Amino acid sequence: FVATIPASAAFNKSRIIDDFVFNAYNTMSTAQIDSFLNSFPDSCISTSRGFKAPNPTGYSPGTSFTYGTSVSAGTIIYNAAQAYKLNPRVILATLQKEQSLVTGTAGCSKLRYVGAMGNGCPDSGGGYNYSGFELYRIGSTVVKSVTGTCVNSAKSAGFSRQIITAVWKMKFWQQRSLGNVSWAEIHGSWDNSDDPALCYTYYMTPGNRARGGTGSGCTQVLSFDGNYTIDGTGVHMSTGATAALYVYTPHLHGNQVFVSTFESWFGSTLSNPVKLSYI
């Protein structure tokens, strides 16, 4: 599902994106996101096309994610960015990397909408079926069922669920890779107070980092050098955001597409050439 690579600057496999850029959640407003989408005549998720999906409205340990009435893609992306303090441009670049929904150049099939972020879509493929809840809508046509999607969980199936669960994962993985075991977004209708108990066993940035959690394999404190192998190539996890994106897409090519897409639209994924304090 990964798109082709547009022209861009050289790809630094060990520093995909800086944490400062990754965390810049106020880079675009709802109106700016919708305007950006409308600038592509064939966009699958523009207001010009009449696209809407349920609005992610909150999270709590007891009810998980909650959703409201259908709203524009810009509203969904903005609200997810605000909820987990993630740059909405990261979301837009991921939507394009995975399904080309921003430009619409690969078509606007139901499967692309339902697996919008490639979230929960393993390399082995899918073949999952879901029904009984709104996945998205175009104009007055509401889509409530899908057959053969790559998405392996109903919690992540459909445009809005793809967005909000992917954004949470990216931010959780970033924070854990930095050793922040107490991270949890708790504000307004968002209460992720159950996050500190979750196990994390993926890529870590260098230093003495706590994994946290109570699951199998969750050693509390270990020393990591930040060096791993991706697609047979040595990679150094220089930033938490870099580690998070490799957990999300454990391949060089997919992350190269992400960087190329982001930089062609929004500029560099790096805040400056100076190394951050935790590198």
Show the residue positions of the predicted features:
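Export/targeting segments at the very N-terminus of extracytoplasmic proteins
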Residues: D19-F20, A24-Q99
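Structural recognition of the beta-strand scaffold that forms the well-ordered cores
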Residues: V90-Q96, G118, Q162-T165
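Secreted/processed peptides and extracellular or luminal domains of membrane proteins
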Residues: R49-Y59, V114, G127, T205, ...
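Extracytoplasmic/secreted cell-surface and envelope-processing proteins
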Residues: S100-A106, K110, N152
